[in-house]
Amino acid sequence: MTRHLIFAAMLLVCLFVCWNAVGARDARSAFSLEETAQDEHVMEERIFINPAGNREKNACLENCRSSPNCENYEFCSK
């Protein structure tokens, strides 16, 4: 009888540990996806918002954003 209780207790402990490990992995994965989305949004803001108020550069960025052939924004910084 005691062996069965010990076995059941060990089984419950193992299940609890495994369940927490799976939950932690899912939480890390969800956090990583959210963090990536936030990083992309921040990078987009850095590209299209010009805090110095340089209107020519902003116009260049807007034109480039609307152009399907534009691959990078390097020429706008010149």
Curated annotation (Swiss-Prot):
This is U-scoloptoxin(04)-Er1d. It comes from the Eukaryota. It is found in: Secreted. Belongs to the scoloptoxin-04 family. It comes from Ethmostigmus rubripes. GO terms for molecular function: toxin activity. The keyword Secreted applies. GO terms for cellular component: extracellular region. Keywords: Disulfide bond, Secreted, Signal, Toxin. Contains 2 disulfide bonds. Expressed by the venom gland. Residues 1-24 form the signal peptide.
